[in-house]
Amino acid sequence: MRHISIFGTSSDAGKSTLTFVIAKILQRAGIRVAPFKAQNVSNNARVCDDGSEIAIAQSFQAEVLAIPTSYHLNPILLKSGINGQASVIVEGQVISQQDVLEYYRDLDTLKPAVQRCFETLAKMYDCIVAEGAGSPVELNLMDKDLSNIFIAKHYQTKIILVADIEKGGVFASVWGTYNLLPADLRSNVIGVIINKFRGDLSLFDEGIRIIEQAFKIPVLGVLPYMPFNLGFEDNASLQNFVQQPRQKKLKIGVIAYPYMSNYNDFEPLIADDEVLLEFINSPISLEHFDGVILPGSKLVIEDLHWLKTNGLFEQLQQRRKPIFAICGGYEMLFEQLHDPERIENLEPTTATGLGLIDDEIYFAKNKILNKAEYPIFGLNIAGFEMHHGISQKYPLYFQKDNIQGTFIHQVFDHNAFRTQYLRAICAQYQGFDFQLYKTEQINNFIEACRKRLNVKLILEAIQDQ
C-alpha cells in the first residue's frame, strides 16, 4: 500500500486538519494508519506516551486515531527562541540551540532520523499520512525540504494537494504548486481538495470544471469553511477560533505574550458556552475580567520583561481577583527567576518575578518531560510537564487566596477541576463534559468532510500498483 503526503498550496491551508481527516477515513476503512510530519516548527508541543516531545498537531492527530504517541510521529521539532535561534528537538530530545542558517547547513545530518522514524512507522502501519510544511514548491529551499519533497521523493508517496480558497487566488496557487513540482511527483498527485469555501458550494462548480479540464487535476472535494476549535497548532490557528456570541456567565482573559506556548490548554474554555475567553496582547485594564490566566511561555524571562514594559506586571501584582498560571506563567509568579545555564537567554540571567509565590525558580539544563496523573488541587489530574524551571517548595502547584498555578498542562481538560475552579468564581457556573464535546466535534467534522470527499478515488490510488 502506498503512503500519502498532504501538501498545502499555501501556509495554513488546512494540512494538519486534513491529515487527521484523511487518516481517520482510511482507518475506518480497515487500514492501519499513522500521522507523520518530518519537521515541524511550533512552540506548541506535548509529551508523548514514551516520554519524548512532539508538536501538538501530530499528538492531536494520533489522539483522533487513538494510537500511541511517540517521537516517530514528528522526528524533528523546532521551537523558536531569542535572536533568531531555535531549539532543535530530534527524536523527542533537545539536541542544540541553533540559528536558522546553522540548522539548514546541518540538515543532511538530520535526514537519517527522519528515515528511521518513517520506516519504523511503516513496519507498524499500512499507510502513513505525512503532513507537509508550508508550500512544497519554495524553489530556493526544495533541496532542504524535509517535510514535503524529501518524504515524497524518497518514499514515492501519493500526494493530495490542499488549497485554501478563503485567501483568494486559488486557481493560481493550485496550478502553480502542481506545475512547479518535479515531474515524478506530479505523476503521484491524486488530486486537490478545495478548503474553507464560504457560501453555496454549487457556486464553485465552474471552478471544479476549470481545475479538472484545463489543469488536468482531479478535484477530490470542496469543503465548506467549518469552525473547529480543537488542535490549535500555531498563532494563525489561534486567531481563527470561534465562540458563540450568546450571554456568558464568566469573562476570562489569557495574557498572550509574544512567546506564548501551548494554546491548547484553553480549548476547553473556548468550547464552554458559559465562558467568554479573550486573549490579551496589549496593556488594557484587567479589572473587567473575572479571571486572568498566565499561559505557558517558550521564553519566560523575555515574556516577563514584556509584562513589565506595558503595565500588565503591576496590574497582576495588585490584582485581588483570581489569577491562574500554567508552566511558564506559573514560573512568573515566583519572586526571582534564575537562568545560570543560559537555557533561555544569551547570558546568565536573573529576573524579578511577580512575587506572588514565596520561592525562586532555577532553570535546570535537563528539561523535565513527564506524562502522568498528578495529585494537584485536591484531585488526580491527567496532564504533562514540559519545563526547565524548578521550584523546591512548590514543585507541582501552588494554591493560596486568589492565586493558583501549576507546571501541569491540560488541567482545564479535567471536567471536575474546571468546574470546581470556575464555580468558585461564579456560583451559577454549571460546567460541561469536555471529553464528550471533543469526541462529538471530531466525529461530526470528519463525517462532514467525508461526505464531500471522493474517498473511493483516494482508496484506489493508494493500492499497490
From Swiss-Prot:
Coiled coil: none
Domain GATase cobBQ-type: 249-417
Family the UniProt entry places it in: Belongs to the CobB/CobQ family. CobQ subfamily.
Gene: cobQ
PANTHER family, A to Z: COBYRIC ACID SYNTHASE (PTHR21343:SF1), DETHIOBIOTIN SYNTHETASE (PTHR21343)
One GO BP annotation of this record: cobalamin biosynthetic process
Protein's UniProt name: Cobyric acid synthase
Pfam families documented for this protein: CbiA, GATase_3
Upper lineage: Bacteria, Pseudomonadati, Pseudomonadota, Gammaproteobacteria, Moraxellales
Organism: Acinetobacter baylyi (strain ATCC 33305 / BD413 / ADP1)
Highest rank taxon of the organism: Bacteria
